[in-house]
């Protein structure tokens, strides 16, 4: 069993924010795989596709760890069964990167997960939302909606990200990393 957590902020106000690309990913994955309807729990919303649970925390981004530890306990999975999908301002828009483990890179949602589950040993799929213009505060940038051009890139990246997770689940992490870590979407 695998749990794929897409990070974002709950509510329609944030739906197309750069910070919500993790939510966009699980929505796309659900659509492609024809998963069950969303079910609501105390700290998260989930959908099931066979032995895969798609999860959206109902907490705000910086408290994502609360939702992840709750779903980890509810679904009886280890941290190695968790894949976290989130935005990365240090990665250009149009790129994705898979990592087996690592630090938070300053991402507060990811840091919250590390703090709550007590380890950084879980797979993560980073989706690029950068570069951030120098004259904009980071918090303001990630909470802005994607531009039309960025949305066209993100639309294609999300398809590739679904493919990447499919390869990861069926052919292994190493194969997915070798195929998709150098991939770049161009318009």
Curated annotation (Swiss-Prot):
Its EC number is 3.1.1.29. It catalyses: an N-acyl-L-alpha-aminoacyl-tRNA + H2O = an N-acyl-L-amino acid + a tRNA + H(+). It is found in: Cytoplasm. The keyword Hydrolase applies. Its main location: cytoplasm. It is an enzyme of class 3 (hydrolase). The record marks 9 as: Discriminates between blocked and unblocked aminoacyl-tRNA. TRNA binds at residues 14, 60, 62. GO terms for molecular function: peptidyl-tRNA hydrolase activity; tRNA binding. The active site is at 19 (proton acceptor). SUPFAM superfamilies: Peptidyl-tRNA hydrolase-like. One of its GO terms (cellular component) is cytoplasm. One of its GO terms (biological process) is rescue of stalled ribosome. Keywords: Cytoplasm, Hydrolase, RNA-binding, tRNA-binding. Pfam families: Pept_tRNA_hydro. The keyword tRNA-binding applies. Belongs to the PTH family. Monomer. This is Peptidyl-tRNA hydrolase. It comes from Pseudothermotoga lettingae (strain ATCC BAA-301 / DSM 14385 / NBRC 107922 / TMO).
């Amino acid at each position: 069993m695998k749990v794929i957590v897409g990070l974002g902020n709950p509510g329609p106000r944030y739906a197309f924010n750069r910070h919500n690309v993790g939510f966009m990913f699980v929505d796309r994955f659900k659509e492609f795989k024809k998963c069950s309807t969303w079910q609501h729990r105390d700290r998260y919303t989930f959908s099931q596709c066979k032995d895969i649970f798609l999860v959206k925390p109902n907490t705000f981004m910086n408290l994502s760890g609360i939702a992840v530890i709750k779903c980890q306990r509810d679904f009886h999975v280890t941290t190695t069964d968790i894949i976290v999908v989130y935005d990365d301002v240090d990665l250009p828009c149009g790129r994705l990167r898979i990592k087996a483990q690592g630090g938070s890179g300053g991402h507060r949602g990811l840091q919250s997960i590390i703090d709550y589950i007590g380890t950084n040993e879980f797979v993560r799929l980073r989706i690029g939302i950068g570069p951030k213009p120098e004259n904009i505060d980071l918090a303001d940038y990630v909470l802005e909606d994607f531009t039309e051009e960025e949305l066209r890139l993100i639309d294609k990246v999300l398809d590739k990200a679904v493919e990447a997770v499919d390869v990861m689940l069926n052919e292994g992490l190493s194969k997915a990393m070798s195929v998709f870590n150098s991939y770049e979407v161009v318009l």
